[in-house]
């Protein structure tokens, strides 16, 4: 442990220069009031780091610099020198000083001072470094104890007293650790709170997505079921239509067989009727021979009518059926006419072009024939041979032309076929490109990753929730602070009014003469006494009574100044005033009285500049201030030369006169107005207003966050909704594209089948072309041989030219023939085929129309004829019956035959009717078959387009009607679910996974929370353990210390179970008295107990040195001796520097320093006892 060896002061307060050795043991410093002895204590505190000038009894730090002879020094410095035991200061020196220097600007600096090789070295230190150094040395200013500190210990609450033990026990370390744990706990709880918000948001999303996911799953399931049902329905329909077509085919086959049976039977009946008719004719011949002509004629006419009626009926039925066919044929022929007319227009355009070419060729032929006629005369021989060869050549040429025409036709057909094949291939390519494009569209339909959006939405909700909570908390805090601000404003107004009132009272206390002198600016005038000093509010009444009117006396520098002022008053008749010249005024020093109830000498209760000390000694003289009149009365008996004034203004004069009663203050002395409260209130107001501004700014910031995040949240939610709709649209596009692809693939399949047929046909045409080309080549060879023979006969020039002309003519004729042939073909096609075809078609249409008209007329005619003939038949039969009676037997035979014939004919007609019915039924079945074949083709197309799916047994059991009803129900149910968010399944799975992550994270945070709670509990237990250990030691020390001074002392906890929820109580029994609490003790007993408490703490953790400043002021003689012995004993372990006026204390010191004032500066003289 280091030792304080020396204190050095330069220009510090009342000391110009001082070097004070501090030996080990007990050092006392004595001196009269105002001598400056307490300035030594201030010097020590100054170095130990006091940051407030007021605590060093100065208005500002620059006020610590010595002021002498009207001039302030440039700086002040104080240095404390310590032994450097165990290299405590980390420098190579036996003695190290800690120096603090202050400049006139108020700025202070720290230095570490030591000697190295007899040279002084200084190292500048920061305040922080110095404080750390003092902390290591155990010197933090709490080893300096003043009478005020004793009062503080006496007056502090038990809680604050416990806090002293808290500090010395070092449990702040646990508090710091606990605070850190609390911060971590707070963080963990904030994280739990934050994650709860996230979980809540994710739960909400999960609930919303769950419904959408279930809908999507249901939608998928229903769509799959719908696909299966549709697939099953198509399969059922295909199967049903195949069975139906098979049944229809079987029905047609059976009907054809039945029709053939009926027709065979008709032929048999016809044979039988023919036989019966032969027999009937024989009978008729016999009747003719035997009967009259009329009967026979009637019979004949009847039979003819019957036959005619029957034939008319057949014709009528046939005409009706024919009419239907004619109507259909008319429509077909009209379509064919339109197509043929289109071909005629195309051929006519071609013919016109070729006719123009023929005209040009004919002009060339005409010119060549003219030349040929001239050459003919010269040519006589070889004509017959040439003619024969030419005829042969012409026949071959015609054959070649014929084959070439056929070849041209085939090549044209081949070209048309190739064009058709190319168109088909182009169509396939176009379809393939479309399929590729559609597939690319399907590939480009990418899913949008919504995970970041949901995560951002979650973060935004957390931000919004926390911001809202923050706003709510801030609003509450703002409300509380506003209420507190209102209270502080009211308190400020009240305190300010009080201070203002005090100042106004001070101004009103002056009479006119004093005010005039003070305002006259006369030389040497200083001020009135009351303005040169100030006291505390609690001493105001006592001081004003003690000083009386002397407080209004005017202080001047010299007597001449007083004379000048008096003349000034006389000349102006301003009244009277009392003047106190500093060069002549003398006062009396008051006695020191150490008794219970004594507050102090009146002069000591007033603060003033030392240069005015004689003025205040004159004003107060031997006046002592005591607590009350009873104490004054007792002390007046003992101290007869002392004037006693009580705190409430009662007076006992040395003469025995007593003055008392109600006193009305006139504010003659300045009160040491405590502006700290007002300043504190103002500081609090400023702090709260600043905090309110920050809160408002924070609320605005959080509100902006809420607004911005809410807008962003809405934007994300809208984005998710758009994504949802886009997903549906993409799915619809994908479904449409898939169907379209299959349709195009099916179309390509049909085209490929068609191309296969066209390619086969092309092969056939190519084969035929090859055959014709081979034949043409053969004919050309034969023709070339004939031409070579002709060349032999055409060797002369005329013949050669004739041959050339013939050749040219042949070529031209050939071209002309070819063109004519083409024209003829075109004309033939138009005239003989197309126009006749149109004419034929028109004729056919006309015929069909005429036929239709005729048929309609025939139908009308035959209906009328049948009705007319039936009427005539009826009449003839009546006549015949009358005539037939005579030829009964023959007639009966005849009638029998006729009946048989009629029966057979009726049977024949019935059979033929059945045949017609069968044919009609066959036609109906054929139509029905075509319809069902078309339906089957459509269903098979659908089956191809459909994706193959597994069909459940339940669907297989349903028939077509049940499936159609079921499909309708499924479609309605699917429609009711739309629109469906198909991403909901993926989003739900992501959010569910996120939910699990958050739950796990929450458990982790809960574990952290539990860990920090456990740590806090452990720290609290350890803190209590350490505190109790220190408290028990201090309590034991307190008992021992109190025992040493002849009494019984006890420290106890208000709350033994939880000491930090209560304070420390002090109970003591001073010598010869019962056990009392601190509140029940007298002032001296309280001081003694406070000192005992301080010594108990000192014994626990001794500091290198202690400074005690007039801590014995309130003690009686006996207790001062006890405390002095205690200090003497404690000084064996630590240095003690004691400021005291008490003889009992000073007499026990090892070294005594006396402080005195000389020419306004403090001096020190030392005595070793």
From Swiss-Prot:
Coiled coil stretches, renumbered: 166-507, 676-1030
HAMAP family: Smc_prok
Function: Required for chromosome condensation and partitioning.
Recorded GO MF terms: ATP binding; ATP hydrolysis activity; DNA binding
SUPFAM superfamilies: P-loop containing nucleoside triphosphate hydrolases (SSF52540), Smc hinge domain (SSF75553)
InterPro entries, alphabetized: P-loop_NTPase (IPR027417), RecF/RecN/SMC_N (IPR003395), SMC (IPR024704), SMC_hinge (IPR010935), SMC_hinge_sf (IPR036277), SMC_prok (IPR011890)
Organism: Methanocaldococcus jannaschii (strain ATCC 43067 / DSM 2661 / JAL-1 / JCM 10045 / NBRC 100440)
Family: Belongs to the SMC family.
Name of this chain's protein: Chromosome partition protein Smc
Superkingdom of source: Archaea
One GO CC annotation: cytoplasm
This protein's record includes keyword Membrane: no
Limits of the SMC hinge domain: 523-636
Domains (record comment): Contains large globular domains required for ATP hydrolysis at each terminus and a third globular domain forming a flexible SMC hinge near the middle of the molecule. These domains are separated by coiled-coil structures.
Subunit annotation: Homodimer.
Localization terms from the record: Cytoplasm
Annotated keywords: ATP-binding, Coiled coil, Cytoplasm, DNA-binding, Nucleotide-binding
Binding-site residues for ATP, renumbered to this chain: 32-39
Pfam family, one: SMC_hinge
Biological process annotations from GO: chromosome condensation; chromosome segregation; DNA replication; sister chromatid cohesion
